[in-house]
Amino acid sequence: MTRTGAATARVQAAYRRIAEVDRPEVWITLRGHDEVLAEAALVDARAAAGADLPLCGTVLAVKDNIDVAGLPTTAACPSFGYLPEGSAPAVARLVERGAIVLGKTNLDQFATGLTGSRSPYGAVRCAAHPDRISGGSSSGSAVAVALGLVDLGLATDTAGSGRVPAAFQGIVGIKPTIGLVPTAGVVPACRSFDCVTVFATTVDAAEAAVAVMTGPAPGDPSGRAWPADAPLGAPGKPRIGVPAPAALAELSVSWRAAFDGVAARLVALGAELVQVDLEPFLAAGRLLYRGAFVAERYAAVGAVLERYPREHLDPSVRAIIAAARDIPAHRLVADTERLARLRGRALAQLAGVDVLLLPTAPEHPTLAAVAADPLGVNERLGTYTTFTNVLDLAAVAVPAGEVDGGPFGVTVQARAFADRVVADVARLITGEPTGNTDAGPAGLPLVVVGAHLSGEPLNGELSRPGARLVGPVRTAAEYRLFALPGTPARPGLVRVGADGRSIAGELWLVPPTALAELLAGLRAPLSLGPLRLDDGRSVTGFLCQPLAASAALDISEHGGWRAYLTSCQTTPTG
């Protein structure tokens, strides 16, 4: 429930904090205090009138390559700036649910870079270590979150811009599957691989924002909907891919120890580590900037090079975009074919695991180091991030403690549409509880009462395709439970009416394709049908034909399958 005046109070606190930290390089455009307070009052009035505003009391910073109505979009190039006709769908959806935009944030010019230092508005410094880079290109949005200026930072990610800054600021960065969040109203970098992302201090907050932004939008040809087989969560004991030691050679000794520590903690929580060959991933990542795909950057903003004087562009950005101008079409075709082969090899590596665990970046350089070698440092920073979008993966970057006095971060990645899986494993790292089941793809509710319960022999038929446990439930007091003959041991639930009892079970959300496979594989006497719960809800569940139960052992007095199994183990013999 939203507290009275939440939006107004949060806006006032945000502007106090902005004045306190005095970091003007974070912003390109900061809205006026009175204007934003007036908007907050309107949001509070809507909330008081009963409007559904889950983001009431949330303040938002938007990277300045994403359109916001009434504010100029510059992409950190003043000559390029324009006033958009309206907000990007991603922004509009957040505002509609109660979020308030404070302003537009600084970035590496045209979202070209991973350092946060390629901007005429100044290099954005790390929140906690001002001598070090913030990470880019979504520098301002990340630092705004890390400094507590805003609750959410809207960003973009082509090669790691929504993840590298998260690692350097000790915050969370979610990069959804490409196309789930509309990119309409976003200045393109490499349109085929661009993605709208979000920064927050927790996985829950970031995932809730992504859920609000997700969904096709008119005029956005790259939009994608959740497929029917999208997994709804990670299994209880996930298989986690980790790279061979050689692929981590660029890490310092202390960072390597920190990464190994994260992996060890996951094992202690029940995960299994599986070594994967990272070479096809790294090779795919190199294609993004060393290959012909960089031509997309020239297609997006190359006209700026021709129209404006050299001094209007950052030298590194200009060099990257200009080099893409003369790439021949046959090279793009060849690289597209090579990427397809590399994608096949990479996905084969992921076939045996639920997620891939990697350091987010190999180092955290100083501003001086970047100034001395801007292109070399930038390329190294993308070692573990540039392949994500070209291979069509989902990713969540999370903080993983402090090393050598600064934040260390890791990223959980998985194939497209496994967004809930990577978020669940990310929560294991941060220590957050299982997330809100409203985020992500929709699942079909299913009640299980026997061998499909958590930890029971047939539970894999739910967990393997990505079903998500909602929690324990009980049936209405109109069922009886019978122990059926055969292996594995399993019960049958029969509705009998007034002579019944309330039986314990679990409610799961199941991907539609997984439920169809369950139904196709069912054998008599079991079936799926409507089952009434003790709270009055009617939910699909496992039922049994009454005729088959007539010759089976009635175990209803135990109140559930697990209680019956426990009684069998404790019943004295002889």
Residue positions per predicted region:
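Short glycine/serine-rich loop segments
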Residues: 87-213, 389-411
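Short helix-loop capping/hinge segments that flank enzyme active sites or metal/cofactor-binding pockets
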Residues: 55-77, 237, 292-340, 347, ...
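Glycine-rich, small-residue loops and helix-cap segments
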Residues: 14, 57, 96, 147-150, ...
